[in-house]
Amino acid sequence: VSAASDVYKRQTHLYAVMYNWQQEPDIQVNNLAAQLSEYSGIIFVGDSRTYFMQKTLLREYGKDAVAKVSFVCKTGEGLSWFETAGERVMRSEIARLQSDSDKPVAVIFNLGVNDLSSHNSGNGVDYKGEANAYLARMNTLAEELESDCRLFYMSVNPVNTAMKPTRKEAQLRYFNDRLQSRLNKRFQWIDTYKYLMKNGYSTYNEFKGNIDDGVHYSTCTYKRIYKYCMNAIR
């Protein structure tokens, strides 16, 4: 390996820190949403990763901990689901929150990992085309939504490719870089990808028989992602 490529790998954190799920540090996040008094509510829009984050928080803390948080998500889905169903649910949730308060609503998107899976397409992924399709929809959305919606996009987070070879890290990074650089300026980027690659994560799904499927995270990792987001939207 040349010195130059070695430096590149170090800079882009190609060597992820992986935890044994039993040794991953645990944190408490049950009161984070309640502390965000500047928002009338927080909406996460995503796929199964968002769904399992919701399940983690409900199982660990109960409904009170996420009283201010809504989850608009569908497992196994991506942009086409958002356009045909998810956006409608998100908009009605925004309207509900705005009817009760004059404070802004925070909307955090975390879609993309399923549209970057060759398992879903049967052959190679047009990951550049997928990134452009996301940009087109999200940038239009930024023009349409009222100014009292605060928009955030959470990076597509790492996959353990040893367990899930249908997704490639380089394509995830391209997708993230493309969105981060070209999303409408109303979007604030939440770089949980870099945070997890640097600080560690565990792909261990306690809701699916404790399997490591390479895509879904441990309870501890989900809580750390949630905390990172809550801090990022302050």
Regions found by a protein language model. Give the residues of each.
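Short, small-residue-biased leader/transition segments that mark boundaries at the very start
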Residues: V1-Y8
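N-terminal low-complexity, Pro/Thr/Ser-rich intrinsically disordered segments
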Residues: R10-S40
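Conserved SGNH/GDSL esterase-like catalytic core that processes O-acyl groups on lipids
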Residues: L36-G129, A133
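Hydrophobic/aromatic beta-strand patches that form the interior of the parallel beta-sheet core
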Residues: I43-V45, F152, Q188-I190
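Conserved beta-strand segments of alpha/beta enzyme cores
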Residues: K68-S70, R150, R186-W189
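Active-site segments of SGNH/GDSL-like serine hydrolases
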Residues: N110-N114, E143-Y174
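Charged helix-capping and loop-helix junction motifs
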Residues: Y127-M138, E169-F175
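Catalytic His-Asp segment of secreted/periplasmic serine-dependent ester chemistry enzymes
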Residues: V159-R234
